[in-house]
Amino acid sequence: MGRFLFVSFGLLVVFLSLSGTAADCPSDWSSHEGHCYKFFQQKMNWADAERFCSEQAKGGHLVSFQSDGETDFVVNLVTEKIQSTDLYAWIGLRVQNKEKQCSSKWSDGSSVSYENVVGRTVKKCFALEKEQEFFVWINIYCGQQNPFVCKSPPP
């Protein structure tokens, strides 16, 4: 009996410690690798979406990607939530200089160390594209109204 209680208590401690990592995000946000993510269906231009993300959570920005795993997670989130008529979802990358080069930083200030860009053009903002199953980033007009994904550190 004592051994059973010890094992049960040990499992409870493990469960509570593991569930605590996901519980760090607000209940309507998703957790992945120490960050919180939320897809917002309302459509905004890039600048308004970035501002909105910063108002939703401390340290919040349009989503940045640091790995294939993070991209896969966000693509699944977008695919589950986006309306069938929407073609794009904003991400936190835009062209920031006169030479039409991508900024070396995401809107959250992190370095662009992982890239999945298709078709660089003179348009300045990037979005995930439905035609490519949201796996690639495409340059589109920043004033376009699109849904978006916010990313933040846990509160």
Swiss-Prot record:
Tissues where the protein occurs: Expressed by the venom gland.
Principal location: secreted
Keyword Signal set for record: yes
Keywords, sorted A to Z: Blood coagulation cascade inhibiting toxin, Disulfide bond, Hemostasis impairing toxin, Platelet aggregation inhibiting toxin, Secreted, Signal, Toxin
Cystine connections: C25-C36, C53-C150, C125-C142
Secreted found in the keyword field: yes
Cell compartment(s), UniProt: Secreted
GO cellular component assignments: extracellular region
Signal peptide: 1-23
SUPFAM superfamilies assigned to the protein according to its UniProt record, in alphabetical order: C-type lectin-like (SSF56436)
C-type lectin domain ranges (all copies): 32-151
Recorded GO MF terms: toxin activity
Stated role: This potent antithrombotic agent acts in a calcium-independent manner. Exerts its anticoagulant effect by two distinct mechanisms. It binds to activated thrombin through exosite 1, blocking fibrinogen clotting, platelet activation, factor V activation and other effects, and it interacts with prothrombin (F2), decreasing its proteolytic activation -especially in the presence of factor Va. In vivo, intravenous injection before thrombosis induction causes a significant decrease in thrombus weight.
PANTHER family the UniProt entry points to: MANNOSE, PHOSPHOLIPASE, LECTIN RECEPTOR RELATED
Similarity remark: Belongs to the snaclec family.
Assembly information from the UniProt record: Heterodimer of subunits alpha and beta; disulfide-linked.
Name this polypeptide is given: Snaclec bothrojaracin subunit alpha
Organism: Bothrops jararaca (Jararaca)
